[in-house]
Structures are given as C-alpha cells and as structure tokens.
Amino acid sequence: MTTPAPLTGLLPLNPEQLARLQAATTDLTPEQLAWVSGFFWGVLNPRSGAVAVTPAPDGKMPGVTLISASQTGNARRVAEALRDDLLAANLNVTLVNAGDYKFKQIASEKLLVIVTSTQGEGEPPEEAVALHKFLFSKKAPKLENTAFAVFSLGDTSYEFFCQSGKDFDSKLAELGGERLLDRVDADVEYQAAASEWRACVVDVLKSRAPVAVPSQSVATGAVNDIHTSPYTKDAPLTATLSVNQKITGRNSEKDVRHIEIDLGDSGLRYQPGDALGVWYQNDPALVKELVELLWLKGDEPVMVDGKTLPLAEALEWHFELTVNTANIVENYATLTRSESLLPLVGDKAQLQHYAATTPIVDMVRFSPAQLDAQALIDLLRPLTPRLYSIASAQAEVESEVHITVGVVRYDIEGRARAGGASSFLADRVEEEGEVRVFIEHNDNFRLPANPQTPVIMIGPGTGIAPFRAFMQQRAADGAEGKNWLFFGNPHFTEDFLYQVEWQRYVKEGLLSRIDLAWSRDQKEKIYVQDKLREQGAELWRWINDGAHIYVCGDARRMAADVEKALLEVIAEFGGMDLESADEYLSELRVERRYQRDVY
C-alpha cells in the first residue's frame, strides 16, 4: 500500500521522514494501519481512555470492511456517515479508500460494504479501477464466505447510470458472495436514499451480531489537519473573485478563463491535486425566459426544502437549469401530454439523445405547455456545485486559489446558451464580487513524497490546471526530480494556456521536457497521445526509472486514448504483450504511480 503524500510545507515532517514513514507502512493491512494509528494516538493521549484498535475477539461478529470509492467526494461522505452509524451501534468497522485497499485480501472478508460512484462512460472512480479490474479478472477469488452490500451513486443524465455499483454488486454475487440487502442506486439528490440505506445496513448487521461489544475500530488512512475546515460543500466559504482573465486568443474557438479567488483570512487550505467546489447562480435572463414560456410571472410561491420562496428565486439559486436529463424529458412529456415528446417515452436511447441536445428551456420552447409553479419545481433536479481542478499551490499564492475555467457556450437555433457555473464565473460575477466555494480533497492525485521522483504530466486543454499547481509546489519545495509536460490544444498562437509560465519553467530548468500537440495547426491532426507514442522510448526510460504518471482532462475520449497509447508504449519498449502491459499499468495504479483526474 502506498499512502499519498501530504503537503510537506504544512506538516512537521521533512521529505525524508515522510519517505521512511511510507516505507514502514507499505505492507500493512488496513486493520494493522488502524491499530498503528490508534497506538500513536494513545501514546499522545495517555489519559484519554482511548481503546486501541484490535481484531474482534473470538466468537464475536467479524469486523465490517467499508470501502469508499469516490470521484467527487459524495461517496466518501456517505461512507463516513455509515462508519459513524456503525460505530454508534457498537459494531466493529474499518473504513478504507478503494485506492488504499489491498484487494487481494478480499477473499478473507466476512462482511464487505462498498459505497461507489460512477464516472465517464460507466467506469468506476479512479481510486477503484484496480479493485474493479481485479474482480473482473481470472485472478478473482471465490467469495462464498463473504456477505456484502453496495450503495451506488450516479446521475440519471448519463447513459450508464450507477454502472460501477451495478458492476460491483453483480460480480460479488457471481463470485459467491451473499447479499446483505439489495443494491441501492441513487441519483444526484442522494441524501434521502443514503440515509434510509444506512439505517438498513445497521439493522441487518446488528441482527447478525451475537453480542453487543464495545466498538473497537476507526477509519484507516492518513490523518492530515489540512482536511479539517469549517467550510464544506453544505457550508461553503463566501470568498472574493479577484481576477477573471481570458487566456485564449481573440480568434480562438475556446473561451478559457484564469480565475483567481481570494480566500481572505478564512484559513482554508488545499493541496495540489485538490478541486475547488463552486456554488453558482443561474442566469436571471434564463430564468425569466423559462418562466415566461410557461405563462408564469416568477413571484408564485413554491416550497423548497420546507421553505416558501418566490419561483424566480428558487430557480436562480436552487435548481439545475442548464443540464437536461432523460427523466426530466419523460416526466415533462407525461405531465404535459406533449404530442412531440410522448413518442419518446419508454425509448431510453431517444430520451438520452434528446436530453443531451436540448436544454430544459428549449424543450419547453419547442413543446410549450401551461404548468403551475410547484409542478415545474417538482420536475427539476437540485442545483449542485461544479468542481474545478485547482491550478495553484498555496506555497506560492498563499490565501488565494486559482482555477482554469473552460466557458461552455453554444447556440440552439440561433439562441445563445451557456454552462451554468462557467458562465457565472466568466460573465456574471464582477471582480471583487462574492462566490461561494469549498475544497474537495483528492488524495488520489498527489505529487510523489520523494522530491527526487520524476513526474510525467499529461493534460490537454483545461486539463493543464493541476499541473500548474504541481510545478508551483515543486518549485517551492526545491524538488530536484525531473518534470515532463505533455499539453495539447487546437492552435499554438491562440490556445497555449499559461505559455509564458511554461517557457519560464523550461528556461529555469524546472521543466525538463515539454511536448506540445496542436491538433489544427497542420493538415494531419496531432493529439497528446500521438506525442506519447512519438516519445515512446524516452517515456519508457522515465517510467522504468520510477516516474509517476498523471493524466487530467476529458474522461470520455482523451483519457481512454492516452491510456491506450501508454499501454502500447509499455508493450513495445518494455518487451511485453498488451495483456502484460495492462497488468503492469494496473500495478502502477496500485502503487500510486499512475493517477488520473478525469471528468
């Protein structure tokens, strides 16, 4: 097991101490790590009465292994809440991130609970990819002695809704596991379903416990003060937008903004690799258009979470208007008896296509109907914050946080449409205006603990963002490890994001190599994956020398194309077939030497 490194400048450990600590804990199981954590806590708190973590006594109910497989933090929050519920019920539980779980020990699990999200085209979260591959490989063991439960989080606006949870649930059963209870698939508004499921899990496990025993377990994983903050997704910090700068050229087809947010004296802290959550306000003009299309005024009272609000205010601040879903289309068609939409009902593929190509306001414009205000509210999904990879390191920018925002803009029959959060930041928040933010920590995208370790960064488009943070941190730490950047975009003159900074890093010697792919500057399109193949021999030398590989950006196409190129490079220059190359890359993932932040 490899524990991701915390920000060295913020901890009382130097890089060498961190490296020794990681080496000492490499072969420990989650239970052993938990015991060590409890032991040292007890050393520091001898009078606290704390109980060190120990295995469940003979004859008692076996401990519950609770695996959190999270992409944006929601699955982690559900898993942490379940852990607290189980501890309160005096049940023995170990919470472990999927990326830290030694999956080859799964055959020895008696009680296994998985909370997982889904990303991309139905793939598991990044931290759970290795576990998923192992379970679906020929090496997967029989699990006749394992009882399990799965909670799956997803988004019905995507075709492969909750696919990761479905995969884990079906495979665990296929391997002989016993279901403790049926899998639950939860949409974006997951809280109520999660609360009910957690209660069911506790009840089922308590019914299996022969004797109530004092709880003796804690969550595993690195403890880091940087995660402790009064500001959360549900209680965000009101910060100040200080800089909004367009960093693509005048003739670029893309509108990309460099956004700087002043955190003031909040004390909010983050690490390179983390994301910034941004709560946004829907465009008042869009709200007005939707309200008028439904022959409403906007001042009608509606109920939102037990409170009465004017319709327009509810739509601006509380509901998703820029992303349509198949469920919304189907429900709107059924509710309004729309002649143009009713033929789509029951046809999942057509509903998905219509939702993906027709925003809510245009659905109403194309299929007008008279709807009362509360019916409209009941049709919509709650507004959720958008996450942006952080493009700065606090070692350099201190009380600021920077993000790189690709503004979503398009036309529907001549009418300008835009993304909710991106247009909010780019167009509607004035400089020195307020924006509500929080940090979403991502321990699955961390710089190596050893500053001598080489780093390979692959980030086309706005995927460049976290690597700006990486380089700022490596510069601040005086890290001597080599750094190699692969970046791509349509045009060199218009789309070279942060060009001056990269050129400075090259000149200073911090950026050892940079390979650039401009897809539209020549007849033949060139992408970052082509550059990977072109530099295959040198790339393999870096990998063979222990380099860590990082990929950030589009999950739907780029990440898959990049992984295919990496596999081909490993196979060709590592002297392997593709199956062996895939196993090799999986090992790199387990060792945290291959990390992705894709969306």
Swiss-Prot record:
One of its GO terms (cellular component) is cytosol. FMN binds at residues 70-75, 117-120, 153-162. Its cofactor is FAD; FMN. FAD binds at residues 322, 356, 386-389, 404-406, 410, 419-422, 599. GO terms for biological process: cysteine biosynthetic process; hydrogen sulfide biosynthetic process; sulfate assimilation. Pfam families: FAD_binding_1, Flavodoxin_1, NAD_binding_1. Keywords: Amino-acid biosynthesis, Cysteine biosynthesis, Electron transport, FAD, Flavoprotein, FMN, NADP, Oxidoreductase, Transport. Binds 1 FAD per subunit. Binds 1 FMN per subunit. Residues 64-202 form the Flavodoxin-like domain. It is an enzyme of class 1 (oxidoreductase). NADP(+) binds at residues 519-520, 525-529, 561. GO terms for molecular function: flavin adenine dinucleotide binding; FMN binding; sulfite reductase (NADPH) activity. It catalyses: hydrogen sulfide + 3 NADP(+) + 3 H2O = sulfite + 3 NADPH + 4 H(+). The keyword Protein biosynthesis does not apply. Its EC number is 1.8.1.2. Pathway: Sulfur metabolism; hydrogen sulfide biosynthesis; hydrogen sulfide from sulfite (NADPH route): step 1/1. Belongs to the NADPH-dependent sulphite reductase flavoprotein subunit CysJ family. Component of the sulfite reductase complex that catalyzes the 6-electron reduction of sulfite to sulfide. This is one of several activities required for the biosynthesis of L-cysteine from sulfate. The flavoprotein component catalyzes the electron flow from NADPH -> FAD -> FMN to the hemoprotein component. Alpha(8)-beta(8). The alpha component is a flavoprotein, the beta component is a hemoprotein. This is Sulfite reductase [NADPH] flavoprotein alpha-component. It comes from Salmonella typhi. The gene is cysJ.
